[in-house]
Amino acid sequence: MELQDLIIDDAVSIEQNTQENTITIKAGDSSKRLSDLIKDFPENCYINKQITGCGGTTLVLRNDVDYVVLVPYVNLLKSKVADNDHLDHINIIKRGGEWTDNDAEISEQLADRSKPRKIICTFDSLPALMKIKGFVPGEFKLLVDEAHTLVNLGSFKAPKCEFILHNYNKFASYVFLTATPTKREYFPDLIGHLPLCTIEWDNVRAVKFNLQRLDKGVSINNALFNLCLSFLLGREEGNAHIFYNSVKEITQVMEWLSKIVGTDGKDRKSVV
């Protein structure tokens, strides 16, 4: 489908710059869902949708195109199934998580062409899906959701991520979708040539991230403690939202803070 044929809302525009290898979708109001703006994503590109909750996977799961939607986690698979399994106008096919021993069922569903076929599959389950009788990749468009995880998970799920990267071009067309894209220079080599498609929204507030480099010998816990303390004591304005992927280390920092600030937020002793 030509780029301009994808547009539903007349306020939307799509521009392609072949020299820079980019596509720009000017989507307008960020409160609108993508399914109200475009019919489908452009083919064969890496898409930065920039915001979450705009209905990227909903768009492809509810349109009239046969799709395989790859998700990195079982919980995401369950969520997509729960949101769409009740719809009568599409045929939802599941592979991964609790839906692993269902080759015969999938083969039967694949044979039903009366409505669009939508396969939701985990990264881990793609190799098994490719072997199922009746599954022909060339009959489907592929969406790799949370595409940045191909880099993030690559260190400990390398075979699964590599399988996707070596097989995505067996599909009729493909889209790599994320709201938090990997920097272009760090793209895996096998998708580094793809056009970068950016969805621009009119009324999105820019979020500023302040990078803090740690001096040699300074632990993450010490740095985090000092950062939290600065906010709690009013030295830094605003709110701090922190993600730290360790319950043990979070507990230690909280214990340190409680000795100085207290669990009620009041200073227990002065800090120099």
Question: What are these language model-derived features?
Answer:
Residues 124, 134-166, 173:
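SF2 helicase catalytic motif II
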